[in-house]
Structure formats: C-alpha cells, structure tokens
Amino acid sequence: MLVKCVLLGLFTLAVFFPRPDQLVRQIPRWKNPDSLIETNAPFLTEINQKIDEQLKPEATKNEEMKAVERFVYREIKYGYDWDVWGNTDYWPTLAEVWQNKREDCDGQAVLTASILRSRGFTDVRIVGNLSHVWVAAGTNEVMSPQADKNFQRVDGKLKVRLPGAKTFLLTWAHINKFPAARSLLLLLAVLILTLHPVWDVKQWWMTFGIGAAGLLLLYDWGGKYLQSSAVGASLGFWTGNLLVLLAIGLAYYTKRPANQPG
C-alpha cells in the first residue's frame, strides 16, 4: 500500500507539474509573492512613458492604477499556466511576463505591481485566493479583485486563511479549462493502482467508464459555473464527484485473491 501511495503521489506530481525545475523555483515564490515585484527592469521606462501618455495631468492615484491595469490587460494576453508553462501553476518573473506576453492572473499581477511600484506606489502588494490573484495599494485594488483574500503579506509576514465556499467552487470549476487528457491519465493511474493486483477486464472498463462519466459531468458543470456562478453546486457537481469516488471505491473493494490483500 505504501508503494502504491508513493507511486500515485509521484504520478500526480508529474501530471500537475511536468516541469520539476519550475516547481522548485515556484516554492519560494508561493511563500513570498511580493519578491517578484521589480522596479529596475529597463523596459519599465518605456512602459511608464506609454502609460503617462494616457493619463491626464490631474489624474488621481486610483485613475493611475486603472490606467496601469488597462495597459497590462492590453499587452499581456490571458493564458492558463498549463498552456503557457506546462505546469498547473507557475509564478513567472517580471522578465518572463514581458517576454512571453501571455500569462494568467499571477503573471499579470506581477507586471502590474512592478509598474505601480516603479511609479511610486511603495505600498503595492500582490493579493490572492485559491482561484485568482490581483494587486492592492493601500485600500485600492485592481486586476479584478475579489472579496475572499486567502493570502497577502502584511507587515512583512504572509497571512494565509482558508478559502470560502464560493472560492472553492470557482477553483474547482476551472477543471473545465484543464486538459482533459491529463485528468483521464490521473484517473487511469488511480484505478490501475487501486485495482492491482486484480486485472479483470470487465471490472476495469466498468470502473473507468463510471469515473470518466463523472469527469464529463464535472467538465460540463465547470463550464456552466464559469459562465455564471449562479449555477452553484448543482446536480452536475455532486453527481460528477460521486461518480469519480464511486469508481475508485469499486476498484478498491473489488474481490481479491485471499493471499493478495492489495
């Protein structure tokens, strides 16, 4: 059982983080997102000139932040980390964001925070939750802020709290954007390791079919939830999760030879 758990853990890491080098670099960035804020990049000068051209002389700080937000959204096209970097999550450096010109919310936040700090917003910080990352400076926030803040640095310390139900559902709904092939590979790995040493073809296809049906329902629910959170934890959400768990449960409780407890 221990060997199976280790193998499953390693395979799960490979599915979610196929680039281990990026994962190693990512760990300290998770601990201190604000460490990615830079102000000495040469290209920031040109960026600030372009932003200044869009601002009125009497622009307020909030208007200035909004101008930076518009610039970042215009210049950095949205792309999920698994499409851009391969890994499920990766916080890029400022140079990587500007070079690729394609990032998800964390990369967009890194660029936004760096621009703002270079413009004199000394209290700028990166804020986020389980599903989204944005930027705050004082009491002002940009980059589609959300009410539920799961992490931010306050007085030099990283403050972390558990996500609320809505944040959890929004995060889970993004399964709709996750490569289906990876989800199926993970399901296959779980079922193979759980069924072993039983190799009954009928049992195998039954459990895989049930699990795949569950994933299909979850992908469908996720797409609907991302269009409108009013969908909530609907029947598709509960049925999808239950079918995946049922498949794993059936695989685990499959009758095994007396001398092979699994």
Regions flagged by a language model, labelled:
Residues 51, 55, 107-109, 262:
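Low-complexity, compositionally biased segments
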Residues 68, 98-128, 135:
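Cysteine-centered nucleophilic/redox motifs
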Residues 237-246:
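Small-residue-rich transmembrane alpha-helices that serve as helix-helix interface/gating elements
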Residues 1-9:
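N-terminal Sec-pathway targeting helices
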Residues 12-103, 136-157, 169-177:
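Secondary-structure boundary elements
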Residues 5, 67, 207-211:
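Alpha-helical transmembrane segments of integral membrane proteins
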